[in-house]
Amino acid sequence: MISADSMLVYRDMDIGTAKPTLEEMAGIPHHMIDIVNPNEEFSVATYQSRVEELINQIIDRGNLPLLVGGTGLYIRSVIDHYDFTTAPKDDRLRECLKREAEQVGAAAMHKKLSEVDPQSAERLHPNDLRRVIRALEVYYQTGKTIAEYQYKDQVEKPKYNLKMFGLTMDRQLLYQRIEQRVDLMMARGLLTEVKELVEQYNGLGTALQGLGYKEIIGYLKGEYSLPEAVEILKRNTRRFAKRQLTWFRADNRIFWIEMDRFENKKAVANEIMKQMAGDFLTL
């Protein structure tokens, strides 16, 4: 199992990321989990490099790599032809953007990015000014988002023989489960986890601005009450799920499975194995 969740790479962030437990991993090797500290930088380019190496190692051992998770760009960086080294650079434009940032502030630059490249804006913290400026630099030069530019949209042999599966359900049921999940996180000690992370890492790092953490940090800063923080987290999670679904729905390679049709997760897993039979598995 190879995680394709951009938040699971961080150590000590367990409850807010719904990190799988040892019991849930059931002795099956899980990769790309707990590999960097929350105050360390970790990029999609680093993810791509590490996972490509992992896939080769797993295949060499005669096993089948399963890429699992919901960070669309992480998945696409591995299965498609993304090149993170060729985006154009313009030193003069970058300096102009830096001067603008000095005048209007990091938050205004992040808002500007959200208007032209919402995907990058969602991924980057407003204080990550270097990367915000880099994404703007690429957009202003090419008219494309940084992800669009990095994707080589030409006819090439696919990197892997693969099958893709997506899980979906009734929207209202999904939102109900999101509310239950947030309540469960709070019951399991999300507030304590965030307090300890802020103390240990001085509240620094892009990771602590991730979904489930920034909302609680807002409460700790006195911006709103704890019940309000919980409601904001539920709202933000619903919005994230909607954007996530929109991203994956655009990929016609995905075979969608309606979870409402199955009694339990085991039945869903059996359906996936049935769909894979003949290509990857001998049942």
From Swiss-Prot:
Cited SUPFAM superfamilies: P-loop containing nucleoside triphosphate hydrolases
Function (record text): Catalyzes the transfer of a dimethylallyl group onto the adenine at position 37 in tRNAs that read codons beginning with uridine, leading to the formation of N6-(dimethylallyl)adenosine (i(6)A).
Identification of the protein by name: tRNA dimethylallyltransferase
E.C. code: 2.5.1.75
Family as reported in the entry's similarity comment: Belongs to the IPP transferase family.
Reaction catalysis annotation: adenosine(37) in tRNA + dimethylallyl diphosphate = N(6)-dimethylallyladenosine(37) in tRNA + diphosphate
Residues the record marks as site: Interaction with substrate tRNA: 71, 94
Subunit field text: Monomer.
Keywords: ATP-binding, Magnesium, Nucleotide-binding, Transferase, tRNA processing
Pfam short name (any one): IPPT
GO molecular function: ATP binding; tRNA dimethylallyltransferase activity
Cofactor: Mg(2+)
Region (Interaction with substrate tRNA): 5-8
Gene name tied to this protein: miaA
Keyword Membrane: no
InterPro entries assigned: Dimethylallyltransferase, IPT, P-loop_NTPase
GO BP term, pick one: tRNA modification
